[in-house]
From Swiss-Prot:
InterPro entries: Ribosomal_bL20 (IPR005813), RIBOSOMAL_L20_CS (IPR049946), Ribosomal_protein_bL20_C (IPR035566)
Family statement: Belongs to the bacterial ribosomal protein bL20 family.
CDD domains to which the protein is assigned, alphabetical: Ribosomal_L20 (cd07026)
Alphabetical keyword list: Ribonucleoprotein, Ribosomal protein, RNA-binding, rRNA-binding
GO function term, MF aspect, one: rRNA binding
Gene from which this protein is expressed: rplT
HAMAP family: Ribosomal_bL20
Gene3D superfamilies xrefs: 6.10.160.10, Ribosomal protein L20
Gene Ontology biological process terms from the UniProt entry: ribosomal large subunit assembly; translation
Protein name: Large ribosomal subunit protein bL20
One Pfam entry name: Ribosomal_L20
Physiological role: Binds directly to 23S ribosomal RNA and is necessary for the in vitro assembly process of the 50S ribosomal subunit. It is not involved in the protein synthesizing functions of that subunit.
GO CC annotation terms, alphabetical: ribonucleoprotein complex; ribosome
């Protein structure tokens, strides 16, 4: 049986990892073993933080809505409850944007929630 040294495929695999590690400092961008560890960790963090990003943005939207609701004399929970009773289906992302960019429009939504509450 002939000996297989895996020259081309091994180099291809290593170069793929080193390409992903481009821009890392020191040995992490030059040495295969260090680069593998760094790239694995980076990909794990990226996977995790794509999910954390969704939580963080929702928390930011809720904070902004709560601040705007309190200006209009409601707490966040009372505003959301009033909107549910009034059958107003507007998501938190849009409400937070309204609160920042159009305070009068948000005040109208808060008034609708207050009327049903």
């Amino acid at each position: 049986m002939p000996r297989v040294k895996r020259g081309f495929k091994a180099r291809q695999r290593r170069n793929k990892v080193l390409k992903l590690a481009k821009g890392y400092r020191g040995a992490r961008s030059k040495l295969f073993r260090s680069a593998t560890e760094a790239v694995d960790r980076a990909l794990n963090y990226a996977f995790r933080d794509r999910r954390v990003k969704k939580r963080d943005f929702r928390a930011l939207w809720i904070t902004r809505i709560n601040a705007a609701a309190r200006i209009n004399g409601l707490s966040y929970s009372k505003l959301i409850h009033g909107l549910k009773l009034a059958n107003v289906e507007i998501d938190r992302k849009v409400m937070a944007d309204l609160a920042v960019s159009d305070p009068n429009g948000f005040a109208a939504i808060a008034a609708a929630a207050k009327a049903k509450f």
